[in-house]
Amino acid sequence: SPFDTRLRLGRSQTRKESIIYFQLDFSEGIDRQALFHILSFISETKNTEVIFGAFSASQEQMEEVESLVNEIIKTQIDTDSLEKGIDYGRAENPLEENGEKELRFQFVNMNDDLDLIKTLEFVRLIVDLNKQPHLYTQIAGISAGIPQINQVETVYVEHLKNGYLISDVTEFSKAAHYYLDMLKEWNQALVYSIDKIKEHTGQRFLDKLHQWIEEVTDVKG
C-alpha cells in the first residue's frame, strides 16, 4: 500500500483553530499571488492558521519566501489581522517574551517524511497549487484524511470528493471555505479517504480506520 499507517485520521477535529498546510516548491518558483490569496484568507477568517512547508530547502530559499510573505503583509494586508487571539485571563502580558505579537503563520523546512507526518498532525486542509503537486504530500493527506486543494488533477485527489480542484488562485477562498466552514463536507472527504485506503490495504488496517472515524464523529457529533 502507498498509504502511510503512521498518520492518524481526523486529528484536526481536536483543535479549535483550522490549520492550513501550504506546500512550497522552490523548483517551480514562488507564486506571489498564491501567497497573497492565502494570507488574505487567513487575515479575514478567524481561528485559521497557515503553515508554509518546504522539503530540504536552503536557508536562502526559506529567507526568500519569508521576506516575500512579510512584504505582502506589509504592503497589502493589515498585520494586526494576522495576530493570534490572546487570552488576557491567562496572560498578564499580551506580548510574547521577545516583545513581538504572535502571528497566525509559520514556516517549516522538513527533511523527511517523519517531519511531514509531525507537521500534518493537526492540519485541517492541504493546499498545493504547484504544477506538479508533491506526491508524498498527497498520499500523506489521504492517509490522514485531510482534504486537499490543487490546481492540477491527479489520481489521488478527486474534485469535491477528497479535495477541491481550482482553475485559478483567485478561487482559493471559495475552495477553502467549502471545507472549513461546514463539517459535513470535511467529514465526507474523511470517509472518502478511508474508501481510498480500503482499495489498497487489508482488513486489519481498515478496521482500525473505522474505529478512528467513529471516534472523531462522536467528538464533533
Language model feature labels by segment:
Residues 93, 112-123, 143:
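Short acidic alpha-helix that forms the nucleotide-activated donor recognition element
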Residues 117, 135-143, 154:
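Short alpha-helical segment that forms part of, or immediately flanks, the ligand-binding pocket
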